[in-house]
C-alpha cells in the first residue's frame, strides 16, 4: 500500500480568498452585484417582509472630474460607512455599480425604511465638511417574500425607477434654490 498525504491548507485558504474576492467590492469591502443578486434571491424565498433601498450617489462624476479619483473613492467609502452605521447584521448592503448601491432591510416596514433613509441622508450630507455637496437619491420598494413570482431584477428595476423620481424631484428643488439665490443676488 502507498499512502499519499498532502497538506491542502494553502489551497483551501486560496479558494476562500478567491470566493471572497468574487463576492466583495474591492474598494468598500461590502458585497458586490453578484453577491447581492444571490443573497436577494435567497431572501425572497423566505416568507418575510423585505424593503429594497436602491441608492445612487449624487455628484460622483463631478467630484472625480474636479478633485480626482482619490477624492471620489473617499466619497464612496464615506457613504458606505454612513450606511453601515444604520443597518443591522441581518440586512444586506452591496455596491451594484460605480455609484449605485442597494440595501435590503429585513422585516422593516416601508415607513420605517423611509425614516431611516432620511436620517442617513441628513447625516451623510452634513458630515465631513467638503467643498462640494454630499447627497444621494434613494428609491424604496417593500415586498413580501415567499412569492415565487417575484424576481430580484424586477424589484431592482422598480426601486431604480423610484430612485430616479426622487433624483428628478431633488434636482428640481435644487434648481429652484439656485434660482432664488440668483434672483436675490440681482
Regions found by a protein language model. Give the residues of each.
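PAS-family sensory domains
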Residues: 1-7, 158
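PAS-associated C-terminal cap
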Residues: 6-20
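Catalytic-core segments of nucleotide cyclases and related cyclic-nucleotide turnover enzymes
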Residues: 11, 65, 114-121, 125, ...
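Conserved nucleotide-binding and Mg2+-coordinating catalytic segments in signaling enzymes
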Residues: 16-38, 55-69, 77
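Short regulatory alpha-helical coupling segments
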Residues: 19-20, 33-49, 80-88
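Short helix/loop segment flanking the catalytic signature motif in cyclic-nucleotide metabolism enzymes
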Residues: 75, 102-119
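A short pre-motif secondary-structure segment
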Residues: 92-95
